[in-house]
Amino acid sequence: MVLQQSDLLILGVVIGTHGLRGDLKIRGSDQDFPLLSKMHQLVFLREGETVLKCARRKAGWYKGHLLLQIAGYRDVRAVQHLVGCEVAVRRDDVPGLPAGEYYWFQLKGMTAVDRRLGALGCLEDIFTTAAHDIYVINGDYGEVLVPAVKAFIADVDLESNRILFDLPDGLVQET
């Protein structure tokens, strides 16, 4: 089966090797990055082209990076060609979450709608603060930063790719 780019979820990039036993040092791309340590089937990409499909042998954390060993590779020279590659997994292989919880990749790109104001725009990014995540929405109201708290989120509909908010007055600057 040929994998399409849309079938894959890129979770990190190989930034180097670690030690002599073929460990790869991976830097994460966003909050979904820790998922990579649990996935068994991996795809390494360079400029959108598949370099290697393989199984994870071992994974562990070291100084904020994921150290990854892949099956069949036990020497640093054998994995050196993977430095600079993106590390992806098949979207279909990602384990589900409990009801009401979502991976960031599921939310990014959703159409954001407020009950009172209507369409806000596209949920383009998410970042973390000490208190909670913040959704970055761009659209007719410019950039709107919405705290990701249950009080503001009325509904998340993955099938229709829409997130419905019930935002308080003053959070969105109306023109």
From Swiss-Prot:
It comes from the Bacteria. One of its GO terms (molecular function) is ribosome binding. It holds the Pfam family RimM. GO terms for cellular component: cytoplasm; ribosome. It is found in: Cytoplasm. The keyword rRNA processing applies. Keywords: Chaperone, Cytoplasm, Ribosome biogenesis, rRNA processing. One of its GO terms (biological process) is rRNA processing. Residues 99-171 form the PRC barrel domain. The keyword Calcium does not apply. Binds ribosomal protein uS19. The PRC barrel domain binds ribosomal protein uS19. Belongs to the RimM family. This is Ribosome maturation factor RimM. It comes from Syntrophotalea carbinolica (strain DSM 2380 / NBRC 103641 / GraBd1). The lineage of its organism: Bacteria, Pseudomonadati, Thermodesulfobacteriota, Desulfuromonadia, Desulfuromonadales.
